[in-house]
């Protein structure tokens, strides 16, 4: 059996609940590691049709003494819905899982969100372990305890905050990740670079210029740093009453774009990439951000092979209406994460309709001045 290799361990402490984020190789097939967090006799593995043929058998092999049931869902954001959620509940009930059961999320952010929401609500809460298999889930979606399903009216409209027992990031799973999915995950890394600034921004920028890949030697520690950044923020503000809202940089635009296209045009990270560029242009239009920094953001997204412009086929008025459903609205005011410079972001609820419209026009393909 391949030897377990540890790169980093990030400890998270939220509301008296502590758990580790373990960045490693061969963790998914290490019996000692997996069973350290699965103390129950019952386990439900939630995965999808893409990941199951690759890793399900390996995970099952390290749980030979457990009642190990499996739910295999359809792959994709469009399936993050009530129907999929109830498929998980049905399996738990039909297989007589008790309150001491454990749910394992084996997959990307969609699987983690749904399995986590099921864990937070089944019999008022059962143990939950994250095994993220996409870069986006490893650096962002699996960290911090947000769980949700989508509603036809908008993304992540029904959800909860629920922390896992552990997040085990096995970097070997990235070897089978499609190139497009890997690049989508880089968008969240760029987001962290903008939030943190300083040397981390420079390292991400340099890594992208050199061509960041699954095999880049700096990747494990960059992933660990992203996890550390998010963990530190979430520890201070678990339920997004203030500081944590900064993690939504670019997401007001991204969620509206995803809803507009029924989750069929872009991966989540690709929509975030467009959202980051929108946020940078909006910050420039409000007189906060210098244009050379906007150009830097654009170059980073281009180096990452990510989209950054809004297609001219999209109705900006309808897109603005979808933004009005955003969960971050407070006191009926739409709030944006604005950028003064890398490392200096803040929440702004005073963006005028004219300023927003002007920014959006300048982000449409072929329209940037």
Curated annotation (Swiss-Prot):
Residues binding NAD(+): 75-80, 109-113, 133-134, 146, 155, 173-176
The record's subcellular location field reads: Cytoplasm
In which residues is Zn(2+) bound?
Answer: 188, 251, 268
NAD among keywords: yes
Q: Where would you say this protein principally sits, based on its record?
A: cytoplasm
The reaction(s) catalysed by this protein are:
7-phospho-2-dehydro-3-deoxy-D-arabino-heptonate = 3-dehydroquinate + phosphate
EC no.?
Answer: 4.2.3.4
- Pathway field: Metabolic intermediate biosynthesis; chorismate biosynthesis; chorismate from D-erythrose 4-phosphate and phosphoenolpyruvate: step 2/7
Q: Which cofactor does it need?
A: Co(2+); Zn(2+); NAD(+)
Q: How is the cofactor bound?
A: Binds 1 divalent metal cation per subunit. Can use either Co(2+) or Zn(2+).
Question: Would the keyword Nucleotide-binding turn up in this protein's UniProt record?
Answer: yes
**Gene Ontology cellular-component terms listed:** cytoplasm
Assigned keywords, A-Z: Amino-acid biosynthesis, Aromatic amino acid biosynthesis, Cobalt, Cytoplasm, Lyase, Metal-binding, NAD, Nucleotide-binding, Zinc
Instruction: Output the GO biological process annotations, alphabetical, semicolon-separated.
Output: amino acid biosynthetic process; aromatic amino acid family biosynthetic process; chorismate biosynthetic process
Q: Which GO terms describe its molecular function?
A: 3-dehydroquinate synthase activity; metal ion binding; nucleotide binding
In terms of Pfam families, this protein maps to:
DHQ_synthase (PF01761), DHQS_C (PF24621)
Read off the HAMAP family from this record.
Answer: DHQ_synthase (MF_00110)
Family membership: Belongs to the sugar phosphate cyclases superfamily. Dehydroquinate synthase family.
Q: What does this protein do?
A: Catalyzes the conversion of 3-deoxy-D-arabino-heptulosonate 7-phosphate (DAHP) to dehydroquinate (DHQ).
Recorded protein name is 3-dehydroquinate synthase
Species of origin reads: Legionella pneumophila subsp. pneumophila (strain Philadelphia 1 / ATCC 33152 / DSM 7513)
């Amino acid at each position: 059996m391949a030897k377990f290799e540890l790169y980093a361990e990030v400890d998270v402490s939220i509301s008296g609940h502590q758990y580790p984020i373990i960045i490693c190789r061969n963790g998914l097939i290490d019996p000692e590691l997996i069973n350290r967090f699965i103390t129950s006799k019952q386990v439900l593995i939630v995965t999808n049709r893409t990941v199951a043929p690759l890793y399900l058998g390996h995970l099952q092999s390290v749980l030979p003494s457990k009642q190990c049931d499996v739910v295999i869902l359809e792959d994709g954001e469009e399936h993050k819905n009530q129907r999929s959620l109830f498929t998980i509940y049905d399996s738990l009930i039909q297989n007589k899982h008790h309150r001491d059961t454990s749910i394992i999320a084996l997959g990307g952010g969609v699987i983690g969100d749904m399995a986590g929401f099921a864990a937070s609500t089944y019999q008022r809460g059962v143990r939950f372990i994250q095994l993220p298999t996409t870069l986006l889930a490893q650096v962002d979606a699996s960290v911090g305890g947000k769980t949700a399903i989508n509603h036809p009216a908008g993304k992540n409209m029904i959800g909860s905050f629920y922390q896992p027992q552990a997040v085990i990031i096995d970097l070997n799973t990235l070897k089978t990740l499609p190139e497009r999915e890997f690049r989508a995950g880089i968008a969240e890394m760029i987001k962290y670079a903008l939030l943190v600034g300083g040397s981390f921004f420079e390292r991400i920028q340099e890594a992208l210029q050199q061509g960041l890949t699954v095999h880049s030697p700096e990747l494990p520690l960059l992933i660990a740093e992203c996890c550390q950044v998010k963990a530190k923020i979430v520890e201070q503000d678990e339920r997004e009453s203030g500081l944590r809202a900064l993690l939504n940089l670019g997401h007001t635009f991204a969620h509206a774009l995803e809803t507009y296209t029924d989750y069929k045009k872009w991966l989540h990270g690709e929509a975030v990439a467009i959202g980051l560029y929108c946020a940078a242009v909006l910050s420039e239009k409000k007189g906060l951000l210098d244009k050379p920094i906007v150009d830097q953001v654009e170059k980073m997204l281009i180096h990452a092979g990510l989209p950054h412009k809004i297609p001219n086929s999209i109705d900006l008025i309808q897109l603005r209406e979808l933004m009005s459903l955003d969960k971050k609205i407070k006191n009926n005011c739409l709030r944006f994460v604005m950028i003064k410079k890398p490392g200096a972001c803040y929440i702004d609820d005073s963006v005028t309709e004219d300023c927003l419209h002007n920014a959006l026009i300048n982000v449409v393909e072929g329209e940037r001045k």
